[in-house]
Every structure is written in structure tokens, then in C-alpha cells.
Amino acid sequence: MKRENPNLFGALLLGLLLNTLLSSQTAYWARIGLLAYPLSAGLLISAALLFAWAWRGVERRRWLRFALGCLLGASSALEVLRFWRLLERVAPDSQNLLEVCLLLLLPVLYLRRVSAIAQTANVVLAALLIAGGLLILSIAGDLQVANLQPVPAHDRQWLQALRGQCLLYPEFLLPALWPDQEKRSPHTVIRLVGYSLAFSVGMHLILELYFGATMPEQEIPVHAAAQGGALSIFNRLEWLQLLLWAMLVSIKLALYLYAGIRLLGGRNSKTENTAVGLDRFPVYLLGMAFLCMLWRGIDLNRLFALRNLAAWLFAGLVLLMGGVQWLFAKRSSSV
């Protein structure tokens, strides 16, 4: 049964953790983020669960499936561009955009089958936890409680924290697409939201303890902290750190591709452990390369903000349509 329906929770969680690791800047102060955690978690859990409930009633509509597929495709291109921008800052002129596309997309050939995504995600998640432990050990001597900023909890700080936490990533919506009822349970969404927000708040706390008042000014703060730590492993083996992040992005791209194929195939996908056909991969590769070339000169922060707005609007539209359909069905059954 496991082979037919692999557990993709690890891949979903990796995709969410990646958003914090590759963030170009911190989003809020740790104390305000901790206070905003319950409200943000409640909003995201409610949105994801309501979307999953409404999606079951409207999933047959092809234009909705196509719209969600477009959202996943655009998100994939943004992930490639974000990693390319990171490489540009870390090692300028080291790789062009086409090379980065090939670096990230070619591993998706191996990750075409869902079982490969699940197994690879679990291995990479373990490696990420080890790397995180080494990072904390490396900068432990520079973590100072005095660096925590006494920021007053004004409306502006609250709004900044909520904007940084209430991001409706596609990973929160994808469990609604899985055929296995157990993987669509509320428990899955609650764990995803809880773990990802806790990781975000925890990383902001560590970075604030390390950088202090200069934390918002740091570019790619997680990488900057790793390079400034006491352990030389992050300097000498920087390529290994970048390779780990590249694998994270490739797993995320493979997950989005699998979800997109499920959307296009509708209910024809009988089992969850299906493989993306090789005949579709050239179209996918060319499409990603085209979008990346098209958007390479646009501000990524603006594109990610538009993606988040599109995700919230799409979830709201699905909820509205699902709610209307449920009301009509209830009225017709009572007549």
C-alpha cells in the first residue's frame, strides 16, 4: 500500500522550509513573529481546510484545474529564478540562467515517480536537519541575548509579521489533490502549517540573536550566518551547501510537476504512485526556460507577492463556488 501511495508529507514540508532558507531578507522581528504565530497559523489552517472541502465539489471544472496548474507552473519558474539570483550574489558570473535551469530541472527526470520524490525528500530532510544542527553549533558562540530588539508591538509591526507569515504557498493547497483520504486529512494541513511557521519563527529568532539590529539589512541571512560561523566547513564546502539547496529546489519542482500532471489528467490517474511521462518533459523544460527568460529582469519580491495574492484569490474563488454548490445541493435535497 505504501508503494502505491507514497507519503509526500516530507516533500511538502521541504518545500515550505525552503521558502525560509532561501529568503532574500528576514520578514519580521522574532518576538512579534512569535506573538503573531497563533493568528497566522489559524488563518492558514482555516484557508487550507476550507479549500480542501470546497475543492471536492468543484474539482471537475477544467478551467479551475487549468488555473491551479498555471499557478504551479508560475511558482516553479519563480523558484528557479530565486535560486539563480542566490547564485549570482554568492558567486557572481558563475552560472548563467540556462545552466541553472538545467541544474535544477534535470534531476526532475529521476523524480518523475512519486515514490522517488518521497524517498529523496526524506533523505534530503535528514541532511537538512544535520546541516541545521551544524549551523547552530557554528554560530552558537555569537548568539547574544542582548541582540534581541525591544521592538514595540505596534500595528505596523503586527502587519509586517502577518504579511511575512500568512503566505498561502501552493504546498498548503496540494493535499486536497491527493487521492488517498488519509493524506487529505486535517491533520496533514495542521502539521504542515505548524511545522513551517515554527521553523520560520525559530530561524528569525536565531538570526536576530546573531545579527541583532542589523538583521533586516542582511541579504540571504541564513547563508550569511553560515559563512560567518566558527566552523570552516560552510566556507570550505560552500558548494555542498549550494548542492543541498539545489536538491531542495529540484524536489519542489518535481512535486509541482506531479501535481500539475494530476490536474491535467483529472481523475484518470488511478493511483498516486504514477510517473510523469517522458514525452511531456521536453515541453515542461522548454516552458520553464521560457518563463525564466521572460521574467529574469522583473523584481522577484514583486512576483512572489503577486503569486501569493493569486493563491489567496484562487482559494477564495474555489471556496465561494464550493459554498454556492453546497447550498444549492442542500436546498434541492430538502425539497
Task: List the predicted regions and their residue ranges.
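Hydrophobic, membrane-embedded alpha-helices of multi-pass small-molecule transporters
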Residues: N5-S24, A36-F51, L68-E79, L98-L102, ...
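Extracellular loop-to-transmembrane helix junctions
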Residues: A11-G15, S23-W53, R307-G322, A329-V335
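Membrane-water interface regions at transmembrane-helix termini and the short interhelical loops
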Residues: A27, R56-G57, R85-R89, L103-V123, ...
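Extracellular/periplasmic helix-loop-helix junctions in multi-pass membrane proteins
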Residues: A30-I32, S269-G277, F290-L313
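Small-residue-rich segments of transmembrane alpha-helices in multi-pass membrane proteins
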Residues: R65-G73, V124-A140, Y195-H204, L285, ...
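Helix-loop-helix connectors at the membrane interface of multi-pass transporters/channels
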Residues: V80-S94, D180-F199, Y256-L286
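Membrane-interface loop-to-helix entry segments
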Residues: L97, L109-I139, R307-L319
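Membrane-interface interhelical connector segments
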Residues: Y210-E238
